């Protein structure tokens, strides 16, 4: 039997696994339990009423959170010419074509998001086996393959989150840091839920958002009472 640590025991005693918490109450609880020596992220798991085995019911997209994620995002852009200048002005950290691809092939990947203009996909396409498994491959469905690379860079820097359901129909993403206040986390979560509802597949029937849980990087999940969010979603 696995040993129960002091931290796990505290979490078990504090979190009622049978209860759905008010969003504000949940945030207070997460802050109380966040005792790691770094500022933990606040992550969300959203169970969707979809059949993930059916391709037409899979959900994928991106949205900019009103208060960002609290992370300093490094952005790499594959583009050239006027788009390269626009990306630089927008705040891109790395810009290039074949030269940038060579860095990636060598394992030099000091970035969190990759954006590409359509004409650059001939170069980026060669990097699929490297970028794909890391979730970094640009995709038009989430706005990272676009002729407007400057806006994509701004979105990434502003706190855009990308989401995609897993094989169990669950969305996992971040909505901020534990040092955000409750109002900021609530507004970020509601913004994500609005985007998700807009992404609901037409073939998905019944309740779409079935369960929402939030947790910190090192903490347990706390189930939310959706009634405390209904005004916005």
UniProtKB/Swiss-Prot annotation:
GO terms for cellular component: cytosolic large ribosomal subunit. InterPro entries: Ribosom_uL1_bac-type, Ribosomal_uL1, Ribosomal_uL1-like, Ribosomal_uL1/biogenesis, Ribosomal_uL1_3-a/b-sand, Ribosomal_uL1_CS. Keywords: Repressor, Ribonucleoprotein, Ribosomal protein, RNA-binding, rRNA-binding, Translation regulation, tRNA-binding. Gene3D superfamilies: 3.30.190.20, 3.40.50.790. The keyword Nucleotide-binding does not apply. One of its GO terms (biological process) is regulation of translation. One of its GO terms (molecular function) is rRNA binding. Signal peptide: none annotated. The keyword Transmembrane helix does not apply. Pfam families: Ribosomal_L1. CDD domains: Ribosomal_L1. Binds directly to 23S rRNA. The L1 stalk is quite mobile in the ribosome, and is involved in E site tRNA release. Belongs to the universal ribosomal protein uL1 family. Part of the 50S ribosomal subunit. This is Large ribosomal subunit protein uL1.
């Amino acid at each position: 039997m696995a040993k129960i640590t002091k931290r796990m025991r505290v979490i078990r005693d504090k979190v009622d696994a049978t209860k759905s918490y008010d969003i504000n109450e949940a945030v207070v609880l997460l802050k109380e339990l966040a005792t790691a020596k770094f500022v933990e992220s606040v992550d969300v798991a959203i169970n969707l009423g979809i059949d993930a085995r059916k391709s037409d019911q899979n959900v994928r997209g991106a949205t900019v959170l009103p208060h960002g994620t609290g992370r300093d995002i490094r952005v790499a852009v594959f583009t050239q010419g006027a788009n390269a200048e626009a990306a630089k002005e927008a705040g891109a950290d790395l810009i290039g074509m074949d030269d940038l691809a060579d860095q990636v092939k060598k394992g030099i990947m000091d970035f969190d998001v990759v954006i590409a203009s359509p004409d650059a996909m001939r170069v980026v396409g060669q990097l699929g086996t490297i970028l794909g498994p890391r979730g970094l491959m640009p995709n038009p469905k989430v706005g990272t393959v676009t002729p407007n690379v400057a806006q994509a860079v701004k979105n990434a820097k502003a706190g855009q989150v990308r989401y995609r359901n897993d094989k169990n129909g669950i969305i996992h993403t971040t909505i901020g840091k534990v040092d955000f206040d409750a109002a900021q986390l609530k507004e970020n979560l509601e913004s994500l839920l609005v985007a998700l509802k807009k992404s609901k597949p037409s073939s998905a029937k019944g309740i779409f958002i079935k369960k929402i849980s939030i947790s910190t990087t090192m903490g347990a999940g706390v189930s939310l009472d959706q009634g405390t969010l209904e005004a916005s979603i």
